[in-house]
């Protein structure tokens, strides 16, 4: 038996439920949303395809139905309105989380809490602070999606299977994120060397263009279709699978830091071992001096926001 509760049945929540239903790793999925009819409709829509896949029980519920869930995926939150600043949105969602998280904990304080709502790094830290849950049991989807975008772009550049591209986007899931080029490789061959062997461009301008494309990917998609949800739902599925299967896989999830690269009291993404008990350990990467400074800058930006929150 494996149960996942998804809080928020919007684009991301509903699509995550769909990808998890297809995964075959979950026996029960409950969708919880203030708009109960939306959750009921999404659950029915997914359920009508169950005869064609592995059996899974998908249904709509309330906070009390998170009881017994192995993983609670939080996608609920306010959307940014025209003219609203990022800080306004952060404060609004922090208020929502301060009300919602204690309600969830009433019914389940044993689950892994996976935060997906943006700004994910801030809300992961907010959840960690107000929940009182042990370190590792609360973390965010972080830059798992960004790293996937990065690998995809490099695979297209090199005409290679993206699964053979090993690269990480670290730091904030947002404007200050960056690629850890110093450890990027293709099947063990450094990216620089691989490009040299294959006659591919790998200069400073190319790297800058790739990073900018990763950072701006969501903006581009939102401009075209209004929202992003397919790829992030695949990222959610991958993280949940790592937990339920106790894979101890390495993913760039966002966790509260406790001294990595001189940073603490914020949540940021670094490659981390993820298994049945959540995040087991954050890996210490051999970053370049420039990358360490970029990471610290990302942390500083997050810390400035956190200082303005009432948590």
Swiss-Prot record:
Residues the entry annotates as binding substrate: 80, 86, 118-121, 146-149, 228
Annotated Gene Ontology cellular component terms: cytoplasm
Short name of any one Pfam family annotated for the protein: Ldh_1_N
An example Gene Ontology biological process: glycolytic process
Pathway(s) it belongs to: Fermentation; pyruvate fermentation to lactate; (S)-lactate from pyruvate: step 1/1
Reaction(s) this enzyme catalyzes, per UniProt: (S)-lactate + NAD(+) = pyruvate + NADH + H(+)
Residue numbers carrying Phosphotyrosine: 219
Compartments in which it is found: Cytoplasm
UniProt key word NADP: no
Active site: 173
Enzyme class: oxidoreductase
Molecular-function GO terms, alphabetical: L-lactate dehydrogenase activity
Residues the record lists as binding beta-D-fructose 1,6-bisphosphate: 151, 166
Residues reported in the UniProt entry to bind NAD(+): 12, 33, 38, 63, 77-78, 99, 116-118, 141
Alphabetized InterPro entries for the sequence: L-lactate/malate_DH (IPR001557), L-lactate_DH (IPR011304), L-lactate_DH_AS (IPR018177), Lactate/malate_DH_C (IPR022383), Lactate/malate_DH_N (IPR001236), Lactate_DH/Glyco_Ohase_4_C (IPR015955), NAD(P)-bd_dom_sf (IPR036291)
This protein's UniProt keywords: Allosteric enzyme, Cytoplasm, NAD, Oxidoreductase, Phosphoprotein
Keyword set includes Cytoplasm: yes
This enzyme's EC code(s): 1.1.1.27
Regulation of protein activity: Allosterically activated by fructose 1,6-bisphosphate (FBP).
HAMAP family: Lactate_dehydrog
Function description: Catalyzes the conversion of lactate to pyruvate.
Assembly information from the UniProt record: Homotetramer.
Protein family according to the UniProt entry: Belongs to the LDH/MDH superfamily. LDH family.
Protein name according to UniProt: L-lactate dehydrogenase
